[in-house]
Amino acid sequence: MLLVLTGVTAISVALLAYVNELTKEPIAQANAKTLSDAVSAVVPGFDNDPIAEKKTQEVNGVQYAVYPATKEGKFIGAAVEATSMGFGGELKVLVGFDAEGKIIDYSLLSHVETPGLGSKAADWFKKGNKGDITGMNPGEASLTVSKDGGKVDAITASTITCLLY
């Protein structure tokens, strides 16, 4: 009996390792395309390759990936990738800023937030929606939720997710 269980376990591990190896490259390519599409969406109009020019910036002990966007050699903005823990787990967001530091747009790259609650963050803060943060400059005024005295409308029952923005 023990030999059978050991054999089944060994075969299962080998199959999982094989499938992992088969899917590693397609997953990496899909993630790269998602990032490329998101950078194009949050900082439109550049003619360089922001992903190839990626820089890492540390602020208050936190590392951020910065993708500078230029047009004809002139800096027009940047996409900043940030990762934080939401209520349900890791939340990865890409925020586009113009040259003056105002938010152009954002893209929620990945999350494991509660469907119907925290997952609304993918659109909640977009232009024209209730929690619209476009045009705001976090360098001039903190992006805090209205219940804490800020100007950002939080998603009902998802304040933790909103605080991450």
Model-assigned labels for residue ranges:
Residues 1-164:
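Flexible, solvent-exposed loop/hinge segments and secondary-structure transition points
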